[in-house]
C-alpha cells in the first residue's frame, strides 16, 4: 500500500485505473471528472479534529471544459464540481487508509457557496478535515471541507460522507 503524503496528477490518474492502491481500492474518476491536479498533503493525524487532513489543488484556465458550456457568455465552474471534488478526496483518503471496495458519496450536512470560480482564476485549493473514519462492515469517511479560489474561501461543506462498498449492484 502506498502511504505517501503527496500525490501528483499521474498518480491520481493511476488511482482512477486501480493502479495506485490496488485493483480493489476506491477509485478516483478520470478525464474531465477528475477535479484534482495534485494532493499537496495527506495525513491521518492532522487537521482540525486531529484525525487527518487533505490539501489538494486544481489549476484553473479558461480552456477547462465546463467554461465552454456553463454558461454561454457567463462562464463559471459549476458548484457541484467543487462539491464532487470534496467527495472524491474523502474517497481517496479511505483508499489511502487501505479500504477496499467501490466508493460512493452518501451525503453532506450543509453546503454554502459565497463566491465563484471564473476563467481568470489561477488555482482552486481544497482543504479537508477528517472528522471520523469507520472500518467495520461499513467503511465510511466523514469530513468538513472548504474550497478556496486564489486564496479566498468561497465554498464550505460539513459532514461530507463517503462509503466504500464491496457490491454496489443494489445500491
Curated annotation (Swiss-Prot):
GO biological process, one term: unsaturated fatty acid biosynthetic process
Cysteine disulfide links: none
EC number: 4.2.1.59, 5.3.3.14
The keyword Isomerase is assigned to this record: yes
Signal peptide region: none
GO cellular-component term (any): cytoplasm
Pathway info: Lipid metabolism; fatty acid biosynthesis
Keyword terms, alphabetized: Cytoplasm, Fatty acid biosynthesis, Fatty acid metabolism, Isomerase, Lipid biosynthesis, Lipid metabolism, Lyase
CDD domains from the UniProt entry: FabA (cd01287)
Subcellular location: Cytoplasm
Function: Necessary for the introduction of cis unsaturation into fatty acids. Catalyzes the dehydration of (3R)-3-hydroxydecanoyl-ACP to E-(2)-decenoyl-ACP and then its isomerization to Z-(3)-decenoyl-ACP. Can catalyze the dehydratase reaction for beta-hydroxyacyl-ACPs with saturated chain lengths up to 16:0, being most active on intermediate chain length.
Protein name: 3-hydroxydecanoyl-[acyl-carrier-protein] dehydratase
Organism: Shewanella sp. (strain MR-4)
Amino acid at each position: 500500500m502506498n502511504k505517501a503524503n503527496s500525490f501528483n496528477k499521474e498518480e491520481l490518474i493511476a488511482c482512477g485505473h486501480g493502479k495506485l492502491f490496488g485493483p480493489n481500492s476506491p477509485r478516483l474518476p478520470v478525464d474531465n471528472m477528475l477535479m484534482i491536479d495534485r494532493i499537496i498533503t495527506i495525513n491521518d493525524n492532522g487537521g482540525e479534529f486531529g484525525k487527518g487532513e487533505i490539501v489538494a489543488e486544481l489549476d484553473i484556465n479558461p480552456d477547462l471544459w465546463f467554461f465552454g458550456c456553463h454558461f454561454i457568455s457567463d462562464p463559471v465552474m459549476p458548484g457541484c464540481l467543487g462539491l464532487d471534488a470534496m467527495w472524491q478526496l474523502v474517497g481517496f483518503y479511505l483508499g489511502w487508509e487501505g479500504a477496499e471496495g467501490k466508493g460512493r458519496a452518501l451525503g453532506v450536512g450543509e453546503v454554502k457557496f459565497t463566491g465563484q470560480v471564473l476563467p481568470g482564476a489561477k488555482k482552486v485549493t481544497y482543504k479537508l478535515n477528517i472528522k471520523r473514519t469507520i472500518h467495520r462492515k461499513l467503511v465510511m469517511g466523514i469530513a468538513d471541507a472548504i474550497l478556496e479560489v486564489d486564496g479566498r474561501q468561497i465554498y464550505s461543506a460539513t459532514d461530507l460522507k463517503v462509503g466504500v462498498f464491496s457490491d454496489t449492484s443494489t445500491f
